[in-house]
Amino acid sequence: MELNHKWIQVIGIGDDGMASLTQALIKLVLNADLLVGGERHLAFFPQFQKDKIDIKGPLSTVVDRIKQEGLGKRVVVLASGDPNFFGIGPYLVKQFGSSEVEILPNLSSIQLVCARSNESWHDATWISLHGRSMTGLAQRVQAADKVLIVTDPMNTPSAIARYLLAYEMNEYEAFIGEHLGGPNEKTGWYTLEQLIDGTFAELNIVLLKRVHNVVSHYPLGVDDEQFSQRKPDRGLITKREIRVLSLAQLQLQPGHVLWDIGACTGSVSIEAILHTPLLRVYAIEKNADDLINLRENQVKFRTDFVAVNGRAPAGLDEFEDPNAVFIGGSGGELKELLQLCAQRLRAGGRIVVNAATIETLATAYETLRSLQFTVSVSLVQTARSKAILQLTRFEGMNPVYLVTGVQSENGDGDHGE
């Protein structure tokens, strides 16, 4: 192996320690002036008696220490498997520059778990729950037939199984790889039910594979009747035609944050996530009964997002700043609500208001203009066919004004017409 002479080498190491390294890499470690790694990795080299940094706490602290103690020296950083796969590699390259860092990977845990399970990994979705919340996992798993999950002591195989079963996702089986590549390696297939009470080593990888066919994709424009709704007031839902046009105006992208204010049944949030699974959604609904229906719909459509009972603008302080805001109901406080949303909206963001009355239209239009948004309005009048005996007629639906406000990339906008 030909090694470059960059002053920071990041070496991937397996669960079997030195046995996973070539002689050239072992020599590189032992000749370093400063050895950096987690306690477990440093313990693989008891013969190394020079300076060490134990990776604990924020990575920024580790970087500061490398700059202070390692400048002008040969620095080796030990990392699990492939340092570029949900590892420390990209962070160090970003902090020190590509010209200063060399990545020397080992077999990744993903490669090993797929080898042990005889599964390919080029067609899998990869998710890391290491140090992350499980919120949003349902829709990401739902969108894939095969999922590889990096876990942590909180997000264990058992916790993942309980989470998925709460969304009735029992069409998956799981392959668990523990201490892969090490002397204590253990692997096996499990049903999700079998995982619930299982105990697994802290070092593990979860492979989920869909083994039963279910409805995993919904076309744009889910029928209103598929959503649980409050009865007898079944009209309290953003109708399919209006929902689709509103989502088009929001122009959502993966990684965006959406606020759904006056969420009611959650139809807008749910359909947004179905077509943009990496969306992060925060919904608020003042009616507790509607929130019950919303949660039923979350389970049915396997969409996990934050939904709270409250009357906006109260409660919005707990939400991430949004890229887009949908307002389906304001409880008579639209002006104040729009002002707060404009303050929190990220540059270039959008606000879409569904207005059923001229008064709501006027308030939305004038307030957004006063806030320097570029404003446009669409009047949507639709009708659905309805059978009468052997004939068919159209039954008109209530007209809805779609008011769209767009903020410029520098936080302001031009007045609309």
Predicted regions and their residues:
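S-adenosylmethionine
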Residues: K286-N287, L291, A307-R384
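Class I SAM-dependent methyltransferase SAM-binding "motif I" and its flanking Rossmann-like core
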Residues: P83-A144, P313, L371-E395, Y401
